[in-house]
Amino acid sequence: MLQINSRLAVIDGWLVDTVKRKPINFRSPEVRLLLPNDDDYKKLSQQNLVDWTRLKKDSNSVLVGVKSMELFKHIKLVLREFFLLEDGRIILKRIRSKLRYKVVKKLTCKCCRLYLPKWGTVYIHPMLKDKEKPLAGVCEFSLDVNPDREYPLIEINVSHQYIIIEGFLLYLNERRLYRWNDNNLRGQVGLTKWAHLRKTYNPVNLDILYSLNSNFYFVKDDLLFQLLGKRVFVKFCKVMENGKCGKAPLWYRVKRTTTAKATHIAYAISNSTAPDSFKSKNNDYRFIVREKPIVENTISNLDYSDIKKQQFTEAEVVKRKISADISQIENVHTQFNSQKEKNNIRVNKVSSEVLDQISKFPVSRVTLLLMSAGQDKNYIELVEELARRLEKICIEKTTQSLEEIRDTFQANPEMQARFDKEYYQSIEEYKITLELIKEDLLITLIKQMENMWAAEKKFSTEEEYVSPRFLVADGFLIDLAEEKPINPKDPRLLTLLKDHQRAMIDQMNLVKWNDFKKYQDPIPLKAKTLFKFCKQIKKKFLRGADFKLHTLPTEANLKYEPERMTVLCSCVPILLDDQTVQYLYDDSIIPEFEATSSYATKQSKCGRKMSLQMEPDLLFQEAIRRMRHLTAYDVLRRNYIAAFEELYMGNCND
């Protein structure tokens, strides 16, 4: 270290303000103010100082390692969190939202911030040499999350999501831990499923932590700390607890501390959130401690095996007591619980790699599936926007229909109050049903839409007039006079065409009509010219969940298939040589959806007029029946598909 004056010194090529404990850029104007003496300034200019601009030019990352242990003894270090991206760069955590690269690893280290006016900000940290002892107070660690590990994701009525990590129940919507033995949670989940989940996963570790005399609980899985986000730095302390016969046994407790003295990271839980029976304890906080230390501290006089033994011994006793208490609650409630549980509870497996990509919960199963499949972020955002628009259309349509039923009781406030209980419950239920329909249909609808843009079968796209009457287009020979396709092998062509014209047709790659005999269902085509010049008829078909059209079933093969629905489609009939008829339809046009017939509409209107003349109780029952019908899965499913078609046709017309 070369002392320039009482304040400035040069340490391994770095100019350091030893009073403010920070590096100073030699090119900064403040250097001249700190060195009014010309001799001192000349002395400084003769030193081989580090060029700060090279730090940014030579590195794609904002975190730069410096091999100077002496330098970091004389400057202040602060703890910062960084992301290691898949392209190899290291960036500051808070600017992740601006980037499109996947985060490979999260790391935290003590560093010093340097600001370069033209180049931005970099952070320097000590880069240790081989066989060199770690610098006291400089800690570096990263959260080590296994991307392939899977966790149970519990969904309650679609909109509430929980995850279980090492026996801790985390409410993802608020990123908050929950006690398992909680009356509100038990009521939300339902007693039967609450008991089943407890036996399967036993997520009672927060209950155990609140019951311990110790104020800490070790956790190995770093995903818990990653999802909770807010972390504190702690260390273990020895305390003397009053025991029997005046003895004072040794006891370990966790205490918050500075980053320089910290041995572990932890998540702090205030005792104010604990049950009333635990609030009398003297401790303000309890800590979920990451089992792996920040840095291996060889100087520490603490025996971590004793600390872990303390937790294990105490936790086993508490766990048995809590399990017995919960079992007793289950038995008592089971005897007196006769209510049917209506909540929709689902448990799925989700990997930590997928969880790391989610910024906000709850997240739909559709999004989870797309993330698991490795879909592009922009594609997922488009699908989510489409889902929101479809949901909005369906909710507006269904709510309008329900409001019409509700208006029936405007003249009878007592009956309306009675109906409103069912009304608001139906609104909640059909919104959940819509979410389930989205999971069942949305990806399928999108795939079918994409398939519509691709030809089902590739035909020749040549367009050529063989004669003023006959045109070859889209792989077909079209009779413009009769406005229909004609078989190239039709014997009538012998009289209608000349030899050279027939020879021209033979050289073209046209559709072989015998191939149509292989198809039992209508054939989708992308043939704009064919459908432009040929007469089309309207015909009813069945449309399956795969969006393909099928012929209507006959009495011989009639069977109930709820996933199919009747549609009216424009098509071109062709008569084959065996006198059977095949139908060609444009697969870029979505057929008309027969939601309700005119007769059914009239019947509905008549039924509404008749309902006004019913007795109040009969009117109420009829209104409930109609409301149940409107919010049924099959009806909402048809509305969802109709909304999708509406958006699709709107985009096509644009």
From Swiss-Prot:
It is found in: Nucleus; Chromosome, Centromere. Residues 449-587 are annotated as: ORC interacting region (OIR). The keyword Transmembrane helix does not apply. The keyword Electron transport does not apply. Residues 322-654 are annotated as: Sufficient for interaction with SIR4. Disulfide bonds: none annotated. SUPFAM superfamilies: ORC1-binding domain. It comes from the Eukaryota. Keywords: Centromere, Chromosome, Nucleus, Repressor, Transcription, Transcription regulation. GO terms for cellular component: chromosome, centromeric region; nucleus. Coiled coil: none annotated. Involved in the establishment, but not the maintenance, of heterochromatic silencing at the cryptic mating-type loci HMR and HML. Is recruited by interacting with the ORC1 subunit of the origin recognition complex (ORC), which binds to HML-I or HMR-E silencers, DNA elements that direct the formation of silent chromatin at the mating-type loci. Establishes transcriptional silencing by recruiting the three other SIR proteins, SIR2, SIR3, and SIR4, that function directly in silenced chromatin and establish repression. Also found in centromeric chromatin. This is Regulatory protein SIR1. It comes from Saccharomyces cerevisiae (strain AWRI1631).
